[in-house]
Amino acid sequence: MSQNSSELSSLDPTTMELLERYGFDRGTFETLRRGLRDGELGDTKNYLQGSLEPPSVNDLVRLPPTASAERSELTLLGQQAIRGGEIAAVVLAGGMATRFGGVVKAAVEVAGGRTFLDLKLDDIGASAVRAGGRVPTLLMTSFATDREVSKLAFAATTSARPVKTFSQSVSLRLLRDGSIYRDQRGDVSLYAPGHGDLPFAIRRSGCLAELRQAGVRHLYMSNVDNLAATFDPAIIGAHLSGNKAITVEVADKARGDKGGAPARVNGVLQIVEGFRFPTSFDQDSIPTFNTNTLLFDLEALESNCSLNWFAVKKKVDGAEVIQFERLVHELTAFLPTQMLAVSREGVDGRFMPVKDLDELMSRRPAIEQLLRQRKIL
């Protein structure tokens, strides 16, 4: 038995049961840790190769402003698709439940006695009712949030917005030599491997097949903590009129923004995550970035695109560890994609994420104002 296999076999039964319940892939794990140990995976291996250019002005499609005739046309197109049963929503409600004092973010109260998840689901449900349709809604959980979010989902389901959960997978953090990280108590450190799990987890759960059988053709993805990314029929209309497999909302960058951005790689327009840009590339040459709100044709999630695993550094109790993640936006490297430029703030604002309690306190007034304007509060 190899040392690696021996390490896994030595895990306690409770940990092994949790890993198995949430789809831990032992073979992939062993391959990745071997690649890390042998130097085949790591920081410099994450960098893109080939020609890399900022997007041109013509690469971005601007969402028309509210009250314009063009926006109204897109809204009608989106509502027609909702009414026809073609649209479902997926809200990312996973993660590690560490930034709000151990409380699952979806269950944190934001405004008017309502939580992040309440407000997300109320928005989707109201949009479904206005369109005269039904929007099946999925919540992607993690091992850390699944129990709590599933309880909330069961209580929140309605005929116009039935709610169901499925979970992303789980893995173990490593040290640079590929060995399993353990803290001072000797405990291993589990993590959820990012939103890149979406295509695989939604298929593995059977939820994607259920959507297809129900006649759904497009899936609207957003983060539970970005309440400005409301379920807007005009965005759906823009996706349909763009006639691309994927639509990604992008917004103007502000100081401190981190994440992916639109770029052309060997001529192909796609989203590139920040850590994938070579150090020689000036990321400030790209004025927009990915807001993590996307629309997919179901075929995009059914495709067999091979998404890469990336070694990402994290700090756990002061120790530097490695975890492997996939990126859902890497699908844009394989499939035709529309970059939809949306407003960040103001009446049309669509990007107000909340990562921790301090950010919630500072952003709450602006979030409440926006939600009132959109009649969600």
Residue ranges and their predicted role:
Residues 1-57:
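A short N-terminal interaction module
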Residues 4-8, 22-30, 75-103:
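N-terminal nucleotide-binding beta1-loop-alpha1 segment
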Residues 19, 23, 136, 315, ...:
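Generic amphipathic alpha-helical segments used as scaffolds and interaction surfaces in large
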